[in-house]
């Protein structure tokens, strides 16, 4: 029934799509299938359109240019957006959140460094900027 409704113009909202999480050990060398690919809900007011594939072109660390053979220089991520939801796949992890400023709807997944350490991050759109605030780090509000 849902497919027929969509064929006749009904919106597929971001809330209709289950939250995605990083699989054990990360998703591997290729991106997983699109998570929000069937979502037709427009982006919320004030959300910057960040959808697409993003690749590091240049980077600095501690004020120094990162060497071309540093693994950071091969980092690529894919961002999907729908409604107030944003999904960032990169480094083997999936960060899926509603950018509504609440801890409840933030990212609850694992760190890219070991695929086991829990991370909790509040996501929001503020003045046209995508803002991430890790939970439990003093001085980050």
Question: How should each PLM-predicted stretch be described?
Answer:
Residues 72-95:
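Short, well-structured hydrophobic secondary-structure segments
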Residues 53, 83-85, 129:
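Structural motif
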């Amino acid at each position: 029934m849902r497919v027929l409704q969509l064929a006749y113009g009904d919106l597929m909202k971001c809330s209709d799509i289950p939250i995605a999480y990083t699989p054990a050990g990360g998703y591997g060398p290729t991106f997983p299938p699109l998570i929000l690919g069937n979502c037709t809900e427009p982006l919320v007011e004030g959300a910057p359109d960040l959808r697409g594939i993003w690749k590091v072109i240049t980077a600095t660390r501690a004020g120094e240019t990162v060497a071309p053979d540093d693994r950071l220089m091969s980092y690529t991520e894919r961002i999907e957006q729908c409604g107030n939801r944003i999904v960032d796949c990169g480094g083997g992890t999936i960060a899926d959140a509603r950018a509504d400023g609440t801890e409840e709807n933030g990212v609850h997944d694992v760190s890219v460094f070991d695929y086991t350490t829990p991370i909790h991050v509040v996501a929001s759109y503020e003045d046209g900027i995508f803002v991430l605030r890790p939970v439990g780090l003093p001085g980050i509000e």
